[in-house]
C-alpha cells in the first residue's frame, strides 16, 4: 500500500512538471510570435516611409 501511494505521488509530480513545462513553453512560443509580428510591422512601416512601394515592402519584411 505504501509503495503504491509513493508511486502515485511520484507520477503526479512528474505529470505536474510536464504540464508546467508545456505551459511555459506555450507562453514562450506565443511571445516569440508576438515579437516577430512587432518586428515585421516596424520593418514595414519604416520601409513604407522610405520607398512607398507597398509590394516591395511586403516582400522585404515578409509580411503576408
From Swiss-Prot:
Coiled coil feature spans: none
GO (cellular component) term, any one: extracellular region
Chief location category: secreted
Source organism phylogeny: Eukaryota, Metazoa, Ecdysozoa, Arthropoda, Chelicerata
Tissue-wise expression: Expressed by the venom gland.
Signal sequence segment: 1-26
Family the entry assigns: Belongs to the short scorpion toxin superfamily. Potassium channel inhibitor kappa-KTx family. Kappa-KTx 3 subfamily.
Propeptide: 27-36
UniProt subcellular location: Secreted
UniProt note: domains: Has the structural arrangement of two alpha-helices stabilized by disulfide bonds (CSalpha/alpha 2(S-S)).
Record key words, sorted: Disulfide bond, Ion channel impairing toxin, Neurotoxin, Potassium channel impairing toxin, Secreted, Signal, Toxin, Voltage-gated potassium channel impairing toxin
Cystine bridges: 43-61, 47-57
Function field: Potassium channel inhibitor (Kv).
Protein name: Potassium channel toxin kappa-KTx 3.1
Gene Ontology MF terms: potassium channel regulator activity; toxin activity
